[in-house]
Amino acid sequence: MVLNHSPPPGLYITGLGSQYPPYLLGPEKLEEFAARFYDVESPGLKKLLQINRSSGIETRSAIRSYESGFATRPEAPTISELAEFYHQAGVDLTTQACKKALRESQISPQHVTHTIGVTCTNQGNPGFDLLVNRKLGLSANVDRMLLHGVGCAGGLAIMRAAAQIACGASMRRKPVRILAFACELCTPNVRHDLAFAEKAPNAENISIAGALFSDAAAAFVLCNEYAMAETEITPLFQLLEWGNSLIPDTVEHMAFFADVDGYRTVLTRDVPQYTKHAIGPMFEKLLPSYQSQIQSSSGEGVGEVAKSLGVSDFDWALHPGGEAIIEGAKQVLGLTEDQLQASREIYRTRGNSSSATVLIVLDRLRSLGKREYVVATSFGPGLAIEMAMLRRCEVDED
């Protein structure tokens, strides 16, 4: 049998939307809150609060202050209470991010063909994506997908899933307009983070999640070439390559699961050591295909440039999982502060909002970064690494 080898489908991000909640909490707020309910001299909690002071985060975005809601009660919220709260506040936050992405794409809700959602801070069936779809007024015939179990890697996992769906549609010569979104409400779980730290038998066994995580939602619209033929807008990015991989023998270093006392986070101090050594091999694996696609779709001059592309030629949307993760990537890859400025800014001013963060960094990179070539990468339980390689559709020549 002879197969016709057609060029890769065209995949374009036409809109991005980020949405933070109204509150910003400094490290001192967590200390004051912890002192109200817990023994701050216990070894585990004392260590967590030390990390909180030295995390490099100036403010974390929060859906509520430490003076309202669950924070005012003597007992921690139950999982069912957290779920009910998420279905209101989380769905509202996600809807706002989605509206921004749709507005920039100039796509009406009725023309969305697929939705892909992700979260690790809400469980249940039907998933929160159905509530978002209803609030946006999407068609009842929209194809829905909700990812689970991918944690902080979720933002790029939904981009990978969107790309695969769009490629399949292109093979069938059908237009797709995929609305993908991520939302995490981490701060309502802080009572459980503090309680687990207080009970820890020693300072070595604590999770540092209570000092890092914040709340946010993000969304993007991805269209294939058939959908782009029906619009006159200039897309933001072309998505050219993507991939994911597990880092061997690391499954015990990151987790988030329902415990009898609430949601529990596992995040060991060894994570940055593993993640920093996983980025380079994934980049080298994806680069040849990325270069080939640029060469085949560009003029001779750009094609020659593509042959020599390396780490230093890209703006990096690195998931800022922590100060050590950012520093580790910078050290191993030889990145400059200029290449990491969006990741630094989001981490410093908003903290780590899990799956939504890398998409927010990519959104911020639009105004901070200047390079034509962009790579985004994030990490999640497994340990897993996700990577996407993009190309700006409009480049500032200044």
Swiss-Prot record:
EC number: 2.3.1.-
Residues binding substrate: S214, D215
Biological processes annotated in GO: polyketide biosynthetic process
SUPFAM superfamilies: Thiolase-like (SSF53901)
InterPro entries: Chalcone/stilbene_synt_C (IPR012328), Chalcone/stilbene_synt_N (IPR001099), Polyketide_synthase_type-III (IPR011141), Thiolase-like (IPR016039)
Covalent S-S links between cysteines: none
Reaction catalyzed: 11 malonyl-CoA + acetyl-CoA + S-adenosyl-L-methionine + 12 NADPH + 22 H(+) = soppiline B + S-adenosyl-L-homocysteine + 12 CO2 + 12 NADP(+) + 12 CoA + 8 H2O
Record-linked Gene3D superfamilies: 3.40.47.10
Active site as annotated: C152
Residue numbers binding CoA: K47, L48, L49, Q50, I51, N52, R53, S54, L267, G321, G322, E323, A324
Domain of life from the UniProt record: Eukaryota
GO molecular-function terms, A-Z: acyltransferase activity, transferring groups other than amino-acyl groups
Pathway(s): Secondary metabolite biosynthesis
Pfam families named in the record: Chal_sti_synt_C, Chal_sti_synt_N
Keyword Transferase: yes
UniProt KW keywords: Acyltransferase, Transferase
Family: Belongs to the thiolase-like superfamily. Chalcone/stilbene synthases family.
PANTHER family: HYDROXYMETHYLGLUTARYL-COA SYNTHASE, TYPE III POLYKETIDE SYNTHASE A
Functional note: Type III polyketide synthase; part of the gene cluster that mediates the biosynthesis of the alkylresorcinols called soppilines. The biosynthesis starts with the HR-PKS pspA-catalyzed carbon chain assembly through nine chain elongation cycles, using acetyl CoA and malonyl CoA as a starter and extender units, respectively, to produce the polyketide soppiline A. In the first round, the KR, DH, and CMeT domains work to produce 2-methyl-2-butenyl thioester.
Known partners and oligomeric status: Homodimer.
Protein name: Type III polyketide synthase pspB
Gene that specifies this protein: pspB
